[in-house]
Amino acid sequence: MDPRSEVLLRQRHLFATPLLLAGLPADDLLAELPQAQGWSWHAGEQAQLDARFPGRSRFDTRAPTGAWTSAVLFLPKSRELTDYLLASLAARLPGGELFLVGEKRGGIERASKQLAAYGKPRKLDSARHCQLWQVRIEQAPAEPDLHALAQRYSLPLADGELQVVSLPGVFSHGRLDRGSALLLGQLQALPGGHLLDFGCGAGVLGAVLKRRYPASRLSLLDVDAFAVESSRLTLAANGLDGEVIAADGIDGAPRELAAIVSNPPFHQGVHTDYQASERLLQRAAEHLAPGGELRLVANSFLKYPPLIERHLGPCRTLAEGDGFRIYSARRS
């Protein structure tokens, strides 16, 4: 059981009425709180919840509608995303109760101050290195417009500016990260065919790929609903076509790909997690056509070349700088 869920269950007497659990982990919490429904924006956790509790959790960037009298937000990493989620929940709970639970190292003390916009926050519990806060909604806000909260910026490229649309919570929100900047300079001479931007975030790499290889089919994949929507907005802002997939890792990707291009993720909330990246290296060959290429950027300290060579083929370093390296390998 997730420690945040354990803290909630210490106060289960507070959750006897219809309840929405926002950002809930894929554990036993829905079994323990049969009156609760879930709202998830993580495709992997949503798949696990669907398998165990069919119809009791929704995958979306917007809060589901329902006759909730209270809601719990599991604190996400991003402050901007927390603002949006709290406003979305508070808008549905005039006079109701909004709870916030999170790890101390995840910033729950700081985030509890964000509850003050809706009433007087109270700390209810502190255990398992987590805290539980509550506020009664005295000032219910209007429903927030997610797209109005997007950060939009122009990326100057040799073939013209690219318009990027980044929603709250998306990796490197509102700016181009250093790893992707290095990889953008190494997208030449990719095999023609079906291209995949794995871990697409706001869709920068995928949009550049479609612009440079217009005859190629493009897919973009991310585990996060806000990233998936950001990528769709970025493609639309540039008049580009592409399939955007919500899936937990490379197993959800198409097969017979000509190339996989990636700035792979290695954070899950406040925790470092290399599982998705390592699984990409281990399983890329199953998704590439013969002669297909994996091209990715990674922190220089990560020992990826041995993994790539073990599971795919000879690994070349195409470029390095600013603490990152660009690796390339082809399926034989």
Curated annotation (Swiss-Prot):
One of its GO terms (molecular function) is nucleic acid binding. GO terms for cellular component: cytoplasm. The keyword Transferase applies. It comes from the Bacteria. The keyword Cytoplasm applies. Keywords: Cytoplasm, Methyltransferase, rRNA processing, S-adenosyl-L-methionine, Transferase. It is found in: Cytoplasm. Its EC number is 2.1.1.172. It catalyses: guanosine(1207) in 16S rRNA + S-adenosyl-L-methionine = N(2)-methylguanosine(1207) in 16S rRNA + S-adenosyl-L-homocysteine + H(+). Its main location: cytoplasm. Pfam families: MTS (PF05175), MTS_N (PF08468). Specifically methylates the guanine in position 1207 of 16S rRNA in the 30S particle. Monomer. Belongs to the methyltransferase superfamily. RsmC family. This is Ribosomal RNA small subunit methyltransferase C. It comes from Pseudomonas aeruginosa (strain ATCC 15692 / DSM 22644 / CIP 104116 / JCM 14847 / LMG 12228 / 1C / PRS 101 / PAO1). The lineage of its organism: Bacteria, Pseudomonadati, Pseudomonadota, Gammaproteobacteria, Pseudomonadales.
